[in-house]
Amino acid sequence: MAKIKITWVKSTIGYKFDQAATIKALGFKKLNQSVIQDDSSAIRGMILKVRHLVVLEEVT
């Protein structure tokens, strides 16, 4: 399965609680942290929900 690298670049302060919960569900603990996840439809849906807070890169 393909992998994607997600980097958390903007704080969740001032945004709804469910967006902060989505950031935690993606595996983030600190701002500017990067995680590598499988490229699945569930992960893509979570990224779509917080697309204004993260940066996405394809990993080859």
From Swiss-Prot:
Transmembrane segments: none annotated. Part of the 50S ribosomal subunit. Belongs to the universal ribosomal protein uL30 family. One of its GO terms (biological process) is translation. The lineage of its organism: Bacteria, Bacillati, Chloroflexota, Dehalococcoidia, Dehalococcoidales. Gene3D superfamilies: Ribosomal protein L30, ferredoxin-like fold domain (3.30.1390.20). Pfam families: Ribosomal_L30. This is Large ribosomal subunit protein uL30. The keyword Ribonucleoprotein applies. Keywords: Ribonucleoprotein, Ribosomal protein. One of its GO terms (cellular component) is cytosolic large ribosomal subunit. One of its GO terms (molecular function) is structural constituent of ribosome.
